């Protein structure tokens, strides 16, 4: 995934055990040892598998690099909960999303986001969205804002299935997408619901959207 290993920290018993293969693959980097309690303190949870690795982040991709050949992308706009970000990435990897764009409030490398994603943050190309959606239009994308408004269309509307390149925009927990983002979108899309339920958690809504709005022939 382009992340350069810098150092390893593991329980001493794992140096010749579970960590041996990892140490060999990482090459000539420092290997430190510590007690299990220390590893748990650093990670924030007790399940560590006994090995931690510090890595250098690669240089961020440009939007053009990761979106030029993409057909379905997701824009995570203002989502701050690490659990939701991790879950969205896992669904994106499983359901055919080609790239993820994030606003600065959303960090996929938060340790909880990485854990919840089951490592999917290292599988799906992602980068920061620091401009308006006009750049997506320049790359040939139509935008679909997931929001409940008086003028939103159902997620199963046939028009959406015909779009060769579609950017699905998911908003923050609670407030959802801003009025400006909704006004700028090519489509405003809602998920039909029953039993007087009017909304879903953003991660759950993302999974529904990714499946329903998948690219034509993507499941063949």
Segments from the language model and where they lie:
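Short, charged/polar "capping" segments at the starts of alpha-helices
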Residues: 13-20, 110
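RNA substrate-binding interface of SAM-dependent RNA methyltransferases
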Residues: 1-4, 11, 26-33, 54, ...
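Glycine/small-residue-rich loop that forms an oxyanion/phosphate-binding "nest" at active or ligand-binding sites
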Residues: 18-56
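Short basic, glycine-rich beta-strand/loop surfaces that mediate nucleic-acid
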Residues: 50-54, 117, 163-171
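Glycine- and other small-residue-rich loops at beta-strand/loop junctions that grip anionic moieties
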Residues: 77-78, 102-104, 170, 194, ...
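Short amphipathic alpha-helical segments and helix-helix/interface helices
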Residues: 19-23, 130-134, 182
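Active-site/ligand-binding-proximal alpha/beta "capping" segment
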Residues: 145-197
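Structured adenosyl-cofactor binding patch, chiefly the S-adenosyl-L-methionine
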Residues: 53-55, 91-95, 105-108, 112-122, ...
